Amino acid sequence: MDGNNSNSQGKCPVMHGGNTASEGDVMAWWPRALNLEILHQKDTKPNPMGDGPSYHEALKSLDFDALKTDMHALLTDSQDWWPADYGHYGGLMIRLAWHSAGSYRLADGRGGGGSGNIRFAPLNSWPDNGNLDKARRLLWPLKKKYGNKISWADLILLAGTIAYENMGLKTFGFGFGREDIWGPEIDTYWGAEKEWLAPSDTRYEDVAKPDTMENPLAAVQMGLIYVNPEGVNGKPDPLKTAAQVRTTFARMAMNDEETAALTAGGHTVGKTHGNGDAGALGPEPEGAELENQGFGWVNPNLGGKASNAVTSGLEGAWTTNPTQFDMGYFELLFGYEWELKKSPAGAQQWQPINIKPEHMPVDASDPSQRRMPIMTDADMAMKMDPAYRAICEKFMADPAYFKDTFARAWFKLTHRDMGPKDCYFGPDVPSEELVWQDPVPAGPTGYDVARVKSAIAASGLSIAEMVATAWDSARTFRGSDKRGGANGARIRLAPQKDWDGNEPDRLAKVLGVLEPIARDAGASLADVIVLAGNVGIEQAARAAGHDVAVPFSPGRGDATDAMTDAESFDVLEPLADGYRNWQKADYVVSAEEMLLDRTQLLGLTAPEMTVLVGGMRVLGTNYGGTKHGVFTDREGALTTDFFVNLTDMAYSWVPVDRRTYEIRDRKTGKARWTATRADLVFGSNSILRAYAEVYAQDDNAGKFVADFVAAWTKVMNADRFDLA
């Protein structure tokens, strides 16, 4: 019960001290505090499967054919509690899959359908995801039947793919392997708005300039997947909408042709729902009453008829045959002139002028009745925008090309955040390598690793050069969409070789030394770069009195320029790296927040972040050789000096400017060291200080080295999906 409840209801007779409501979060008192919880959201404790067999192991026993057969049957098995449009759930399942995958954004790789996140807040309650809770409940019998052998994430995206197959499309393929999460993804920033569908102005510097949308966002309003179907801020104007569509889809890594194909193919089947009063709907799933059992948007006027459903507020199908994948979208869009009308729910939509009765789709519940088709403002953009129109005309002239382009774009949409093909499972994985999958060839494994390490050690490279280069190669990894990382040695290719954060001159020098070593040994450069980092760490550990061997698994390959979509790699360029105490520019976001974001994308925990930063500082790996945070007189030795001096009360910390500090002797006032916010946060934040104190203890020097090596190896192997 609410301890602040002062109304007539009785108070709980037992003192209720559990912080069970979200508004009781203890950190709500300090909203600017670092949210370290984003580093631990995938803790195994909330996972009911515990340490049992992995999902990928369970997949091996899945009867794929039986599941697909059952899925086909489900699509036409209409249920009274949520009747199917036209007796077919295909449109609903496609929308579920689309909206699950469509939250992906290229900038940080977050969102997307790879984790089943649409089951949880906020996505399960976004206005744009209205009534998709019904689609998930329709899939429950299949999830119940096949159990641990199929994740929700896979099942949802498979449902959309099978729906297209059932309605006549030859799909490009399907990869299983998405693992479910068990709670909301609290690391993802969806926007600053505090209300659903707040005007776009909040997230744009200038709504008239779509490229001014706040990064990393990829949707025009809070609670939408892409654009407002009624137009910019709900005001129809196809050309303005076209500009927003272009930017929105580009932020999902889609070009104009893929965007036009997805728009047309997505609206070839299914319908919109707005035949009623949207104000009569119940609250979204997260706000619904207990007895609704997770059902949101309850419609008191449904009456068992699909044609009475209300979702987006728009009402009608796009094509004459909404359960067939055909060319009907283009035939209607380009075959008629269109005018603005309002749906029964009051939404702005486009309707054809003087349409022939035989071109009108039948009613979703009563096939004896015909209804007016509709187009959204985004559909009209395909006709009015010159570039989109030219693409659509190309599709109309070559239906086979359109269907293949759409099938490939759908595959990309539903697999974009899965990572390389090593992460795909099942009988329908396409054999074709696609450049957006960031392919990497298999690397050699039979070479003499010890010989390579000896050659590196004798090369004259410094510890800092070796460790920094290996780190820079691996730090691009993003667990969000499984891109980046050391495998492929793309650090030697454009654009990475020219990134400021990679110190191109230093990088070229190091690669010039390592490349002949790799060549002579028959090893990949990717492996040798990582080995060089390991050699540097082993040398530094010995200098501190610890004899360690850093684990290493050969087999990384070297990607080529032809395997690399250079433009799509631009988003992986680090703007800051707290591990190397570097920022490309002065940002509004603090250095410690950017460090936290990098850490989360790398899949590291707060203790791992702590030990890595402390170790990297004493190894002298700072960008440009700066001395910020190098709290040691033994640079190059893997000691705990960073933590010892950070926690020593003999020193005070004095700001020099907004970003840097001096560490001064309290008695003499003499400056001893300098630091950045990315250093001092480990003494300021109470949680991080607790970790720092562990490593500052006299008895934990050995633990520090062991923990550093383990965290380092985790980063170096983050993209080694072939080892799983």
Curated annotation (Swiss-Prot):
Entry annotated with the keyword Heme: yes
CDD domains, alphabetized: catalase_peroxidase_2
Active site feature: 99
Cofactor names: heme b
One protein family per Pfam: peroxidase
Catalytic activity: H2O2 + AH2 = A + 2 H2O; 2 H2O2 = O2 + 2 H2O
Tryptophyl-tyrosyl-methioninium (Trp-Tyr) (with M-252) cross-link, renumbered residues: 98-226
Superkingdom of the source species: Bacteria
EC number: 1.11.1.21
Modification note: Formation of the three residue Trp-Tyr-Met cross-link is important for the catalase, but not the peroxidase activity of the enzyme.
Alphabetical GO biological process terms: cellular response to hydrogen peroxide; hydrogen peroxide catabolic process
UniProt keyword list: Heme, Hydrogen peroxide, Iron, Metal-binding, Oxidoreductase, Peroxidase
NCBIfam families named among the record's database cross-references: cat_per_HPI, PRK15061.1
Family: Belongs to the peroxidase family. Peroxidase/catalase subfamily.
Quaternary structure and partners: Homodimer or homotetramer.
Stated name of the protein: Catalase-peroxidase
Organism: Maricaulis maris (strain MCS10) (Caulobacter maris)
Recorded name of the encoding gene: katG
